[in-house]
């Protein structure tokens, strides 16, 4: 089944075909590091982490770049208010970003460029636009001449006339046309600056990403992503610069995730509904937010509320319990007269999952397939308990179902990182009662139990102890380790 992706540029789903077979180059616009990350940032991070993981699952070598905007008006203003160098502010919030990303198991990008370490590349990029006649200097500022790029507006589906109606030249700006945008800003008193052919200054936001993409990924990439709010003007302006310079498509596929509201309202500090990621993981396991984000299609709006977090927590517990409950069945007597297994349900769930994911990363439908498997697992478990026994085939099928849930959740959705998929046979399997148990195996099981206890997997630890007791081996926990003796 081929992967289909909704392309913002064309407004339709398209078969995914990377430029180089087997390789995918992705760039997503990162955060401007002037404040703590909020739930909107979290959604974008989780969405593109999921996309990256699924592409990798499909066998692609994914080269993923996400930048940091570490010099900007907001950073400079905060630095002034706190009487600190701008770099102290940006360094602080880059560290906060990495802390949040680690908590939510966002895989680090392969390359994470910072604007301030790419100033020569940005200046060189701007100079090429000036030389090509698409940009002009005006008293130390450099602007892009929008009307010279005839396809301007093709991403956001806006015409020049529409844009002109709301455009104006701000006091102090020296651009020739209200539509033109800044590539280089001349230095102001008390602000950071770099030397350039046009004098002291700093780069404009829209040109930074272009220069970093050209440096690290080339002139045409496979996927460019970001939040829906970046479609215009940021991504529109990126296309104009890059394609004016090369005459080639800048990105084959443009992917934008929907925005986040809070209780139906736009998130803002003035409304008091600005939800930081720190606040979320102080109250919930990070997996809960990941699951909430994935329960809504990435292109749809996501309305965040604490009530929805509670609902999602309950759904997460259903998944988690299904994965962990293999030991319940292990405690039942073996009865080969028990009928039923989960192999067909596993196949159906896998097929449904990958079909949904290959249809523009339809995570709600993919999750529905997983919860369908959970339902079948619960039915089998309840039937076996009522029956008072279970066949070996049924137990193994349950373990396989638990492993399927765990591995898909971990590898593609970034869930269950510390969860045991099921009881590993090599950790808990003991010989039949009539056979003796050797000391090497006892020691292996003691070590496995100790590991489970350290990871707070107490159910598994207790099961190992009980299984050894069935063999006549009694464990005695002491401050300096666990000892054993025969009953």
From Swiss-Prot:
Classification via SUPFAM superfamilies: Anticodon-binding domain of a subclass of class I aminoacyl-tRNA synthetases, Nucleotidylyl transferase
Residues reported to bind ATP: 269
Subunit-structure text: Monomer.
Residues that, per the record, bind Zn(2+): 29, 209, 234, 238
The family this protein is said to belong to: Belongs to the class-I aminoacyl-tRNA synthetase family.
One of the record's GO molecular function terms: cysteine-tRNA ligase activity
Residues annotated as transmembrane: none
Domain of life of the native organism: Bacteria
Protein name per its UniProtKB record: Cysteine--tRNA ligase
Motif placement: 'HIGH' region: 31-41
Top EC class of this enzyme: ligase
Primary site of residence: cytoplasm
EC number: 6.1.1.16
Organism the protein comes from: Sulfurihydrogenibium sp. (strain YO3AOP1)
UniProt-annotated location(s): Cytoplasm
Motif 'KMSKS' region mapped to chain: 266-270
One Gene Ontology biological process: cysteinyl-tRNA aminoacylation
Free-text cofactor note: Binds 1 zinc ion per subunit.
GO terms under cellular component: cytosol
Known catalytic reactions: tRNA(Cys) + L-cysteine + ATP = L-cysteinyl-tRNA(Cys) + AMP + diphosphate
Gene responsible for this protein: cysS
Needed co-factor(s): Zn(2+)
């Amino acid at each position: 089944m081929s992967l289909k992706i909704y392309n913002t540029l064309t407004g339709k789903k398209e078969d995914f075909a990377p430029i180089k077979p087997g390789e995918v180059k992705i760039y997503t616009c990162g955060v401007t590091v002037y404040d703590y990350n909020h739930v909107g940032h979290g959604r974008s991070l989780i969405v593109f982490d999921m996309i990256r993981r699924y592409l990798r699952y499909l066998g692609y070598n994914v080269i993923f770049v996400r930048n940091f905007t570490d010099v900007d008006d907001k950073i400079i203003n905060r630095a002034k208010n706190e009487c600190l160098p701008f770099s102290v502010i940006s360094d602080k919030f880059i560290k906060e970003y990495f802390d949040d990303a680690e908590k939510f198991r966002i895989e680090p990008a392969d390359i994470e460029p910072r604007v301030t370490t790419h100033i020569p590349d940005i200046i060189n990029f701007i100079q090429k636009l000036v030389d090509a006649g698409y940009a002009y200097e005006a008293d130390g500022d450099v602007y892009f001449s929008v009307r010279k790029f005839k396809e301007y507006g093709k991403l956001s589906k806006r015409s020049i006339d529409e844009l002109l109606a709301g455009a104006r030249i701000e006091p102090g700006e020296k651009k020739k046309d209200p539509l033109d945008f800044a590539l280089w800003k001349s230095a102001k008193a008390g602000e950071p600056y770099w030397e350039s052919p046009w004098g002291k200054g700093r780069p404009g936001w829209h040109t930074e990403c272009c220069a970093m993409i050209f440096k690290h990924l080339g002139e045409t990439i496979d996927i460019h992503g970001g939040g829906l709010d970046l479609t215009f003007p940021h991504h529109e302006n990126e296309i104009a610069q890059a394609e004016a310079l090369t005459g080639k498509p800048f990105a084959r596929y443009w992917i934008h995730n929907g925005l986040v509201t809070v209780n139906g309202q736009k998130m803002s500090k003035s409304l008091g509904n600005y939800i930081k990621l720190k606040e979320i993981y102080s109250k919930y396991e990070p997996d809960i937010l990941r699951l909430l984000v994935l329960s809504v299609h990435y292109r749809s709006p996501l309305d965040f509320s604490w009530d929805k977090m509670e609902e999602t927590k309950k759904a997460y517990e259903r998944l988690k319990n299904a994965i962990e409950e293999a030991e319940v069945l292990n405690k039942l007597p073996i009865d080969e007269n028990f009928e039923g297994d989960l192999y067909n349900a596993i196949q159906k769930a896998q097929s449904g999952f990958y079909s949904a994911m290959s249809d523009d990363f339809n995570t709600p439908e993919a999750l529905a397939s997983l919860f369908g498997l959970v339902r079948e697992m619960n039915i089998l478990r309840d039937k076996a308990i009522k029956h008072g026994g279970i066949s070996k085939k049924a137990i193994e099928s349950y373990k396989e179902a638990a492993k399927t849930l765990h591995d898909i959740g971990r590898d593609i959705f970034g869930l269950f990182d510390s969860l045991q998929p099921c009881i590993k046979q090599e950790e808990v399997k003991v010989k039949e009662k009539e056979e003796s148990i050797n000391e090497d195996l006892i020691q292996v099981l003691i070590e496995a139990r100790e590991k489970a206890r350290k990871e707070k997997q107490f159910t598994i630890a207790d099961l190992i102890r009980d299984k050894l007791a069935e063999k006549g081996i009694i464990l005695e926990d002491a401050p300096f380790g666990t000892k054993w003796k025969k009953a």
